[in-house]
Amino acid sequence: MSQQVIIFDTTLRDGEQALQASLSAKEKLQIALALERMGVDVMEVGFPVSSPGDFESVQTIARIIKNSRVCALARCVEKDIDVAAQALKVADAFRIHTFIATSPMHIATKLRSTLDEVIERAVYMVKRARNYTDDVEFSCEDAGRTPVNDLARVVEAAINAGARTINIPDTVGYTMPFEFARIISGLYERVPNIDNAIISVHTHDDLGLAVGNSLAAVHAGARQVEGAMNGIGERAGNCALEEVIMAIKVRKDIMNVHTNINHHEIWRTSQTVSQICNMPIPTNKAIVGSGAFAHSSGIHQDGVLKNRENYEIMTPESIGLNQVQLNLTSRSGRAAVKHRMEEMGYQESDYNLDRLYDAFLKLADKKGQVFDYDLEALAFINKQQEEPEHFRLDYFSVQSGSSDIATASVKLACGEETKAEAANGNGPVDAIYQAINRITGYDVELVKYDLNAKGQGKDALGQVDIVVNHHGRRFHGVGLATDIVESSAKAMVHVLNNIWRAAEVEKELQRKAHNKENNKEIV
């Protein structure tokens, strides 16, 4: 019988570090729920000591997620471990993941320490983490550039201290697959107590070898793989989990291991991460790219028509990609929309049917037929706009031409008030943004603007994603409409609501901190 490979997802921790704009607590929870539905064994959801906001996000996810083990990162620092435990303690069961560098370069230049001191510190911190939970993971940062004999000493000491998972990261994506396999094999040969822990790997893609290194490590005995959906992460990214998962499934003949992942949720989880993180998936991306199952060569097309297995080593359906596209019209009822969402794998908790159906009817009136990709786009926007809105777009109009200065008029609901402004700009989008900024008074700098068609044809929905800089912090906004000017306006209103909500959250955190200090004084 094949052994299980544990899937450890770090999309919300290592993956988020690569984003241009930080995710809100709601967005993180949305991704966490998608990962839970896909069946990841462990999800690393943040670094609680880094900020009050991260602490709150970790705590919220730990409270809600039940079917995956929630994990938080901590340096080999007492405060890090204590704060991680505080954030996680609301979970039924949790993992603390602590780490310290072990390579000669990092020890000498970053830590200004010695290997013996590193081992002593690692042992102390693993024991401290064990005071809070039996599930402690220890990572040897930059293990790929650590001599295997040194690595073996650290690993043996960490296991003796109580670590139940030992992670071997290729932190800078330096090693080759045959080298990495040799490191894992070398640890099995040198560490006498290695059977008391699960060996994990965490690889980066600086040389394009993250997935290859992870698979080589699994073949050599590793039984946990860490990575992120779509491979997002620091620099060139992390190991793409969907690629490792499907490689293990497709090549079970030689890997002789399995995962407990629900493969049919891979496509939707990938899309969720891509949209929320504002990181488009390349067309030629393995497994989840839009061209992953496309056949343009005549020879290939002929072969696929005769037998799909001639040129397809897996099916789109195996990752949950339904290629049968049905269309609905304005005559389709709520029940039909709900039924189609269920057929596409959506649960009622994934969207608000009333709001979705209202948006569906408006779109159907505009373009006649509404396709699956339209419904999915509407459901995504529906989810993003569930939170309370301080600003709401009531009305806009734009006048522009080839030789005219663009002029926009905008009416916004701002809390209980309604305000209107007009402005000129360098094109219709800029004019609308100038008018909106006049109304709100927010000082924002547009740093990124992306427009993507959600579907096919001239009447396709256009999704606009923007990133703005506000007082040194970046925020993401998204808008969806058949009119790209309207999409752009909605994206700016969305980003301003995100800024407003972040300010409200900050006020609440300050209030809690103030109350906590007052309670200390009373005691």
Curated annotation (Swiss-Prot):
Sequence segments annotated as region (Regulatory domain): 392-523
InterPro entries: 2-IPM_HCS-like (IPR050073), 2-isopropylmalate_synth_dimer (IPR013709), AIPM/Hcit_synth_CS (IPR002034), Aldolase_TIM (IPR013785), LeuA/HCS_post-cat (IPR054691), LeuA_allosteric_dom_sf (IPR036230), LeuA_bact_synth (IPR005671), PYR_CT (IPR000891)
Major location (coarse): cytoplasm
An example Gene Ontology molecular-function term: acetyl-CoA C-acetyltransferase activity
Positions annotated to bind Mn(2+): D14, H202, H204, N238
GO cellular component, one term: cytosol
Transferase keyword on record: yes
Protein's name in the database: 2-isopropylmalate synthase
Annotated source species: Salmonella arizonae (strain ATCC BAA-731 / CDC346-86 / RSK2980)
Gene (name only): leuA
